[in-house]
Amino acid sequence: MNKEEAKILIDFMEKIGYRFYEPELLYNALCHSSYAHEQKQRGRKDVESNERLEFLGDAVIDLLLAEYLYLEFPEASEGVMAKVKAAIASEEALAQIARDINLGRYMFLGRGEEVSSGRERDSLLADMLEAVVAAVYIDGGLTAVKKVFLSYFAKYAKEVVEGKIVFDYKTSLQEITQARYRKLPEYVLVNEKGPSHMKKFTVELRLSGKLIAVGEGPSIKEAEKEAARRAIEKLKGD
């Protein structure tokens, strides 16, 4: 890694309060595939995509959450624990934790991801958080992961259990509409505009043909999530 990249790693380690024994692990975790591809085209051989770390991080987060929920909520049933774990391991929740530690500021992205607001995209932030969790796990074990991240996961787990926050908007909305109306929501793409690297999609959410909410986002998936979030707010107010 070069000096500029090394400085970013030092800043991030200070941010999360953990100093890596092997900083190369963190460097790998922060390298998006777009950045690795660009750097390899420039002749660099030390830059690898973080995709393998994402795979491991997903499993580490599952273990961290399962252990925490089992110990912290002894009265909770398997079904309740599974539901809470799914909510906290969702893309939306992981992206929020990534924002809590300002992860977007420290990521290494290719030019295309930079211009398309990759640093703010839920999917990219969630994947990057998984990679960083895996890097901490390899470097310092589960104890280090708990030290760095458990407080963030625990905070949101408690809020989900208490019903104070929703992360998986589409699933939550589906549960509401099935229980209340015995119907499933329908998502309809009604508009798509902008250049290929800066698309903006508009989705209408309908229930039994009736317009309930509209969502916009840089992808159809993000627009659907926003529509579901707005629909939940509206239905809770009814």
Curated annotation (Swiss-Prot):
- What is a GO molecular function of this protein? ribonuclease III activity
One Pfam family per UniProt: Ribonucleas_3_3
Biological role: Digests double-stranded RNA. Involved in the processing of primary rRNA transcript to yield the immediate precursors to the large and small rRNAs (23S and 16S). Processes some mRNAs, and tRNAs when they are encoded in the rRNA operon. Processes pre-crRNA and tracrRNA of type II CRISPR loci if present in the organism.
- EC assignment: 3.1.26.3
Keywords for this protein: Cytoplasm, Endonuclease, Hydrolase, Magnesium, Metal-binding, mRNA processing, Nuclease, RNA-binding, rRNA processing, rRNA-binding, tRNA processing
Q: What is this protein called?
A: Ribonuclease 3
Cite the binding residues for Mg(2+): 54, 127, 130
Q: Name one GO biological process term.
A: tRNA processing
- Which residues are the active-site ones? 58, 130
This protein's source sits in the domain of life called: Bacteria
